[in-house]
Amino acid sequence: MFLKAVVLTLSLVAITGARAEVSADQVATVVWDYFSQLSNNAKEAVEHLQQSELTQQLKSVTKGHISALRVIEKGRERNSWEHSRRVGPCEIMGRQVGIFGQPLRVATLPNCDLPVNSVPPNTHLSQAVGPYAEELRTQVNTHAEQLRNQLTSHAQRMQSALRQNVDDLHSSLTPFADELKAKIDQNVEELKGHLTPYTDELKVKIDQNVEELRRSLAPYAQDVQEKLNHQLEGLAFQMKKNAEELKAKISANAEELRQRLAPVAEDVRGKLKDNTAGLHKSLAELSSRLDQQVEEFRRNVGPYGETFNKALLQQVEELRQKLGPYAGDMEDHLSFLEKDLRDKVNSFFSTLQEKESQDTPVALPKQEQEQSAVPLES
């Protein structure tokens, strides 16, 4: 019934303001086709909104706290504006075009007022894994300092033995030199044993948080569940690959430290056959050489945690781009539809007004006007 009223109204406009060749059926067909197309665009906008929610879900992982605060603040401003005005984009559309916008407003209004809180809490994958990378730096510093203290303490014991056994340096200091080499091997192995478990814990944490991310995104990716699972599996594989590379780098640097410290112990052992002055000089330099090698190890391994975090953020951002092909949100799209609708309706009536100004309207007799008005009243 409503559509018949629209067609009848447009028919009257066409009869009274346009040329005879512009029929009411043609006008009704044009307007109805346009609203059908506009309704389809509105459905696409709703689908884009769902994709946008998925995009925002993943984007929050890569942008961190600052971006999260911006999104929250923007959402608050938008909600405040909407609640204060008590009007949404679809209602504006309906008011602009009067009765012509009513069917579209009824069809799309339920989807325009989707609550902001419908999106589940964000799963901050980087925040969950990040503490392990920071803990790695802390453990590197702690155990490197322990290694430094133990080797330095042993060097000091050798210096003390040198002062007490000037007459028989070779026999008194040889055990210390052998012990120094053994301590280097022992402490490097302990260092590896303390640091490498953190990479194994990282891999376990990765599996847990990727699964949590999968569950939280499932309601928003029902139509692309297979693609989502595939991409999340790829994300977990790349992250665990990064953890394995981190473990390999730690082991390689520990072995390199062992190789650099071994000549230091051999140098001291070789000086036992030299004079006392040369041995004193070698032992005096021993502590500083040990400190230098351990400090270089700490500087090399410490930043690996930050490198891991950066790789994690990059991989999550790549996942977000793969799963979020649609940009923009529902409100922006509906604003465009509103403007497009208003422009086309204005253009339509402007065309009628131009025709009216160019042609002299055909005056109907009063009796015919009264007769034509009777069906409207019934």
From Swiss-Prot:
GO BP annotations listed: acylglycerol homeostasis; cholesterol efflux; cholesterol metabolic process; lipoprotein metabolic process; phospholipid efflux
Renumbered residue ranges of the record's region Disordered: 354-378
SUPFAM superfamilies: Apolipoprotein, Apolipoprotein A-I
Pfam families, per the entry: Apolipoprotein
Keywords, ordered alphabetically: Chylomicron, HDL, Lipid transport, Repeat, Secreted, Signal, Transport
Signal peptide location: 1-20
Subcellular location: Secreted
Nucleus listed as a keyword: no
GO molecular function, one term: cholesterol transfer activity
Residue windows of the Sequence repeats: 33-54, 60-81, 82-98, 110-130, 131-152, 153-174, 175-196, 197-218, 219-240, 241-262, 263-280, 281-302, 303-324
Family per similarity comment: Belongs to the apolipoprotein A1/A4/E family.
Chain's role: May have a role in chylomicrons and VLDL secretion and catabolism. Required for efficient activation of lipoprotein lipase by ApoC-II; potent activator of LCAT. Apoa-IV is a major component of HDL and chylomicrons.
Protein name from the UniProt record: Apolipoprotein A-IV
Species classification: Eukaryota, Metazoa, Chordata, Craniata, Vertebrata
